Amino acid sequence: MGSAQARQRLLAIFGQVQAYIFQVEMLKRCDPLALLPLVGSLKLNALTIRMLRRKLGGALIEQAQHQQTPLACALTMALEYAEVEGERVLRAVDDVNLAGPEGFFRATMRLDEPCEYHVRVHLDTYGGPIDAEVQFLHDAENFLKQLNYCHLITGFEAGLDALESVARFLTRTVGSGIVVPPELCDPTHPCSVCFEELCVTANQGEAVHRRLLECTCDHITRQMAVRVANIDIARHLPHALSVASERRAAAEAALRALEARRVQGHNGKSAGTEDPTQQVASRLLESHHVFKPASRCLYAVSELKFWLASTKHGDMGQPRAIDTFTENLETLDKQEKFFHLQAATVELALFGRTLDHFDRLFADQLLGLDVIDGMLVGSCAVSPDDHIEALIKACYTHHMSAPLLQRLTDPDTSNREALKQLLGRIGVDTDDGAGELGDALDVDLDNLGGAPPVNSTPCGEDALCRTVSEERPWDKLLERATADASQRRRMYAERLSKRSIASLGRCVREQRRELEKTLRVNVYGEVLLHTYVSSYNGFCARRGFCAAVSRAGTIIDNRSSTSAFDSHQFMKAALLRHPIDQSLMPSITHKFFELINGPVFDNAGHNFAQPPNTALYYSVENVGLLPHLKEELARFMITAAKGDWSISEFQRFYCFEGVTGVTATQRLAWKYIGELILAAAVFSSVFHCGEVRLLRADRTYPDSSGAQRCVSGIYITYEASCPLVAVLSAAPHGAIGAETVVIYDSDVFSLLYAVLQQLAPGSGAN
């Protein structure tokens, strides 16, 4: 079976296991008495999970010993979680007669146990032990990035032990299905992908770290838009084939009756909420027909109705933000109550009783939550997007409660006031209610359209067609000044109001992204799992390399050989007397960046490869390395090449005795690696034996049989017990065989001397 077919089968199994986990999580929240008839199926599923673990567990463990893949890792975690939680539900169902429904929920959801998401992580570095606690998803990612930065001062055994603790945390989180508990995720903490995205997008002059403060991470967890419709129960009820058709028909009839009552009440309420002024104007206009002459006032009423209607229906393409958020918290509360009423009605019709689900049994505790906690918990009747729209609606409503803002944002206000004043001038009282509108409509519209009497003003003419007198006597000066001041004050207030509304809209747009990320349903992304697998494979490759070179045909161990001192002295004297070619400094610096970078950021190995300094930049920036250390790291090789770059004593290369602290140990490791790179560069130029390939042990990979592929070269293993290994005469594709020569050493110069001897004519090495 090829790798593609194996991957397809693993994906199919993984999908079924995920579906089973989702069902188990649903059963944890259902009435336990409803699970009693399903015990046989639950046991069969639990046995199937056990069979899968027994059948696939050995192969998955064997693969994990060599190299892990995200799919295999996710399947391993999902199988472990499914077995534990599925059998937990079975045990709780068996004890439900004694513990009751509340005891069932407490057992399945671990309500009386300490938080399962607190995991202690211990890491032994060459500079001392490190203890950390992982309790959030970003804590796990931060620790993996820190371990990636400190990989060169951490042995593979210590690294794998620390990753084992992280794996336990990931099993309880990433392995628990697709939905993320809201208490695990904090979207304000950016991940490595967030940083990389900001590095390749336009920054408009802002620093990356400043932009990170406004970043909302959607990579470790991804938000999903979930919509809940009122007709979901009625839509799925006909497909409930496990109940009798008569009961199902009764439930459908009860739902239709509930919906009819709700629609009738809604229509009655809507009919009574029309503005009285609008009612009077509508009935006044309806009493007119084309055989009657239209007065000037009647035409004005019609024109105002036209403008009110046009503003309501005109701009349909781009509705205002205030008009799009039509729901509020009270409406959502009514919607949720109606949903629960529907559910209870259907349950009574189908089963003859209401079910004791988790949210009903613990309703008193849920009611004690405040508004924010209640929205985080969510509801099965209201989608998160409805809550978000209600919050934004409430924000707009509170901000626009000022009369001036209402007049500015609602241009119909002036039209409605003008319509009310006009109706008052023609003798129609809009405050008496709909019961007295009949008398108000007995208006002689013909007289309203006739000529005005002598020495009188036409009806409403001073309000609609006001003219400005040409005479401006001095006694009106104070009145005009007051009017001008009022006009300027009104224009200034409108300008401030427009600016206020623009600021509010900008704030809502900026905060909506974070609000959606917080309240929407989140599922696990692939970033955290990929980061864990990359870090695990790096330490696992170092372990596999050490095991592979131990099977070589010829092994020369100079780590404790006293006879190698002369070789050390000869090679050191030969190399130190020659200066370093400055034209090689760019390549030497890049080699330094390549060897100190961790296994997680391997941008140099991508299809569109980037230079090693880019990957190292991501590595140090993601751990928040201090600026002075970044400057020291950037100029490290240039500074080392100008001075005495040989720092290690005989057989004490990569020795950290007497050094404590991560920073001091890290700096010493940089010096050791710089010494190795400079010695190899001078060695190649002095002895003209070609380029000496400096390789990393964690960049070796196993083949299909599990054997580690190690091409010829000098490897740095980052292990204090055996830091340097030379592999010579490796078989094609890097296979270690009987013809391979392996040299162990803990001294750079004696290792180069041994390599020179092996490369001499007649040795047969290459």
UniProtKB/Swiss-Prot annotation:
Q: Where are the zinc fingers (C3H1-type)?
A: 191-219
| Entry binding sites for ATP | 683-690
Q: How would you summarize the oligomeric state and partners of this protein? A: Associates with TRM2 and TRM3 to form the tripartite terminase complex. Interacts with portal protein.
Q: Which HAMAP family match?
A: HSV_TRM1 (MF_04014)
Question: What is its subcellular localisation?
Answer: Host nucleus
| Molecular functions per Gene Ontology | ATP binding; zinc ion binding
**What Pfam families does the record tag this protein with?**
PRTP
Q: From which source organism is this entry?
A: Equine herpesvirus 1 (strain V592) (EHV-1)
What's this protein's name?
Tripartite terminase subunit 1
Q: Using the UniProt record, give the first listed, main subcellular location.
A: host cell
